[in-house]
Design a protein with these regions (language model features):
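Non-heme di-metal
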Residues: 1-212
Length: 212
């Protein structure tokens, strides 16, 4: 009887873990699809942003950021393929339009607004890849974790640069501030704490309301 009870409890535990892994896989897949198309919008927007800048050092910095976003897109696409999924075609078209719209705005919107807007968006991207790494862990995709954390760190670098640019402008004093991300090393430290935890909450992924 005791052995039977233990077996039933073990089976129930496996069932719960299996359901969590399946749910995490679904959420991870959707989040990666959002990230993949979001990177497309970012690339398009940064091309316009770069063209709007006169300062050569700033243009070179945007060039590096564009290359990072292209690498991120390639990495995310590979992960989607491993999950048996791919980009959402309708979302790709939508984010292409969004990116081109922002690109056009950068050419006429002055220096500060593109720097400010990019910083806000990059801050969100940090969290997006952190959540993806946690979902990958629960989804039993450990090979995804390090690349996702590395992408979060690169997005942290982007946010840090855009924040430094924006805060140097007088308009920064009157614009709403977004929350400053924790120190860069906290990305890995917080993931390690999540990994050690017995309670690993799962995120329900939703598309940003502005681009649904």
């Amino acid at each position: 009887m005791l052995t039977s009870s233990i077996a039933r409890a073990a089976a129930a535990h496996v069932g719960v873990d299996g359901a969590r892994a399946r749910f995490a896989t679904e959420q991870l897949t959707f989040l990666l699809q959002l990230a993949y198309s979001g990177e497309l919008a970012a690339i398009r927007a940064y091309l316009g942003h770069r063209a709007s800048l006169k300062d050569r050092a700033q243009r070179r910095a945007i060039d590096r950021i564009i290359r990072d976003e292209v690498r991120h897109r390639h990495c995310v696409l590979g992960q989607l393929a491993e999950l048996g999924a791919g980009p959402i075609a309708a979302r790709e078209r939508k984010m292409e339009r969004v990116g081109r719209g922002i690109s056009t705005f950068c050419l006429v919107g002055g220096w500060f607004a593109p720097m400010y807007g990019a910083g806000r968006l990059e801050a969100q991207n940090i969290r997006e890849y952190e959540v993806a790494a946690r979902l990958a862990l629960v989804a039993e995709r450990p090979r995804f974790v390090d690349p996702l954390l590395e992408m979060a760190e690169v997005e942290w670098d982007h946010e840090h640069w855009f924040r430094a640019m924006a805060t140097a402008h007088p308009a920064w004093r009157v614009f709403p501030k977004w929350r400053q991300p924790p120190p860069r090393e906290e990305i890995r430290a917080s993931f390690a704490a999540f990994e050690r935890s017995t309670d690993r909450p799962l995120h329900v992924v939703r598309a940003p309301w502005l681009v649904r």
